[in-house]
């Protein structure tokens, strides 16, 4: 959740004493069906680019979702994905995604999808993405551990696709000081909530950019899409290297 941020306090405060934190977070969450995304629409349209943005989405009932929205180069909402299951204490903030899940979008002849954070550890979610023919998998996350980049490399080899991992760089000094107990819970520049870990991985598992650790910045790479069919010649997990007569994925579709 890049906008308004990640609810890190759920790991530091008792759940019944975080009302002020939750209220601030909810008030700054994004109403996708309202006008909150209009500045993003205008920016994408002006620049002529597609944008995938991690957000906390607020619906009319008040529930919050950890979501990714896709905005096309005409400045229109092209799709949305809600995280299937929040992780651990995140469930005190975000609800389970129930529709607009496992969404993919086509950018020219490139199919893009996203799995958020530890959704990438859900084998069936990965298979569903492979079955949808994803070429580039976005993996925004709060996980900045040493194990995360090997996870992305495994997925890139398993799916023979590109994986773009996005991890925030946030420090204690980034937390608003007018929130209750903020000074006690968070330190200054040396208190790293997340050290970053953004990376880009090619089909087969080669790390082609990043990881960017210890500072804010932008990670970029040029994606050679010819590497996808070349890799799948040897291993196509939902094609010639599958056994649907033995193993199948039966998923529920939501309109």
Residue ranges and their predicted role:
Residues 3-9, 69, 81-87, 199, ...:
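Short beta->alpha transition motifs characteristic of CBS
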Residues 23-46, 148-178, 250-254:
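Short, compositionally biased leader-like segments
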Residues 12-13, 68-73, 155-157, 180-184:
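Short, hinge-like loop/turn segments at secondary-structure boundaries
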Residues 16-35, 186-193:
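A short acidic, glycine-rich active-site loop
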Residues 29-32, 37-42, 57-136, 141-154, ...:
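Active-site catalytic loop in hydrolytic enzyme cores
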Residues 104, 168-255:
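C-terminal beta-strand edge segments of enzyme domains
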Residues 1-14, 21-24, 44, 51-52, ...:
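Active-site beta-strand/loop signature of hydrolases that rely on acidic residues for catalysis
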């Amino acid at each position: 959740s890049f906008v308004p941020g990640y609810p890190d306090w759920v790991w530091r405060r008792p759940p019944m004493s975080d009302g002020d934190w939750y209220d601030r977070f909810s008030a700054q969450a994004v109403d996708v069906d309202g006008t909150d995304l209009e500045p993003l629409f205008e920016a994408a349209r002006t620049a002529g680019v597609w944008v995938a943005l991690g957000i906390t989405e607020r619906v009319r009932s008040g529930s919050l979702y950890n979501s990714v929205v896709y905005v096309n180069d005409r400045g229109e909402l092209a799709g949305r994905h809600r995280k299937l299951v929040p992780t651990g204490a995140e469930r005190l903030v975000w609800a389970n995604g129930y529709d607009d899940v496992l969404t993919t979008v086509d950018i020219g002849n490139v199919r893009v999808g996203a799995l958020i954070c530890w959704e990438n550890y859900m084998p069936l979610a990965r298979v569903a993405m492979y079955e949808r023919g994803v070429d580039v998998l976005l993996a925004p996350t709060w996980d900045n551990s040493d194990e995360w980049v090997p996870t992305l490399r495994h997925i890139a080899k398993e799916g023979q696709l590109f994986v773009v991992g996005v991890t925030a760089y946030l420090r204690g000094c980034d937390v608003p000081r007018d929130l209750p107990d903020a000074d006690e819970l968070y330190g200054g520049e040396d208190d790293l909530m997340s050290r970053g870990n953004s990376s880009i991985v090619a089909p087969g598992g080669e790390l082609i950019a990043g990881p960017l650790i210890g500072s804010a910045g932008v990670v970029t790479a040029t994606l050679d899409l010819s590497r996808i069919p070349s890799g799948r010649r040897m291993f196509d997990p939902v094609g010639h290297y599958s056994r649907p007569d033995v193993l199948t994925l039966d998923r529920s579709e939501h309109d």
